[in-house]
Amino acid sequence: MSFTEKPAVTKERKEFYSKLESHDLAPLWEVLNEVVTTKPKSNCAPHLWEFEVAKEFLMEAGTLITAKEAERRVLILENPGLKGLSRITTSLYAGLQLILPGEVAPTHRHSQSALRFVVDGGGACTSVDGERTTMQVGDFVITPPWAWHDHVNDSDKPMIWMDGLDLPMVTLFDTSFAEGYGEDIQEITRPNGDSLARYGANMLPVDFKQKGLSSPIFNYPYERSREALEAMKKANEWDPCHGLKMQYINPLDGMAAMPTISSFIQLLPKEFRTQTYRSTDATVFSVIEGQGKTRIGDKVFFWKAKDTFVVPSWYPVEHEASSDAVLFSYSDRVAQQKLGFWRESRN
């Protein structure tokens, strides 16, 4: 017996297994090599979604159903290896949400942690627990678990962002709760930008008391993130596997900005090719700027601004930028690290 071989099935064993089944029992040795694998094994598949194709379908959806009727008008980025499960990886969800000028996505809250990464348009607002923020392309916005949130588009342009949630994790633990607010728009009790000013300047209020596990900042503006990357670029210090890669953090503890999802931004200079890398956290990428290609296992995907692609767990990956490129990404790394599962391999 080993982790790669199953014991032979004899007539006597087969009869025994049939008797076990009628009593809701099963022999571990028949499935051990499937539940304890020698390396990560998943149905999650490498894939790329072209934004222009998805946008066309989103705009068509906008003619068929309102944001209010749908609660959230979203097209799920469903991994082709995980059909029917509403997942982009085994543990994470992704979707593209459209909100048209004048529309409101009503206030609600739920157990799931959510991120919004703005892909197209600009000027729409998200409100979280009494504070409203105006969103622009490249902004990383957090909705903590059980926080009231709504979306309003007072601009004259459609806006599309990527939703990233830990839906499969919450489903795994059977811990999903959700409720509506009763009104479309929640009461605004704090000025726009309050949380960034209060917690995003290397200071904290003297009487601060932590609430929850998420970052108290809920909008990380792309303008500031891009400036940081540009300044660090001058040092000419490039990680061979990542280029210049930074993690969005919770200023209270320096850890990931969200309790179950790690989020990153990275710069790949023109003609930079990363060395082979793999890690156990399947990762979703959204291209902010530039173009290039990524080899995932034995497949090569060519990408450009606004496209989305996914790298499954433990697949070897190499990025190559044909122009200066900036990528946003998110994964379940922080959850894996807290549980002692996470592993990486370079070269």
From Swiss-Prot:
Annotated NCBIfam families: gentisate_1_2
Protein name: Gentisate 1,2 dioxygenase 1
Assembly and binders: Homotetramer.
One GO MF term attached to the UniProt entry: gentisate 1,2-dioxygenase activity
Organism, scientific name: Aquipseudomonas alcaligenes (Pseudomonas alcaligenes)
Gene expressing this chain: xlnE
Pfam family, one: Cupin_2
General function of this protein: Involved in the degradation of gentisate. Catalyzes the conversion of gentisate (2,5-dihydroxybenzoate) to maleylpyruvate. Exhibits broad substrate specificities towards alkyl and halogenated gentisates.
Effect of residue 338 to Y: 1.5-fold increase in relative activity towards gentisate
Outcome when changing residue 181 to D/H: Does not improve specific activity towards gentisate
Cofactor: Fe(2+)
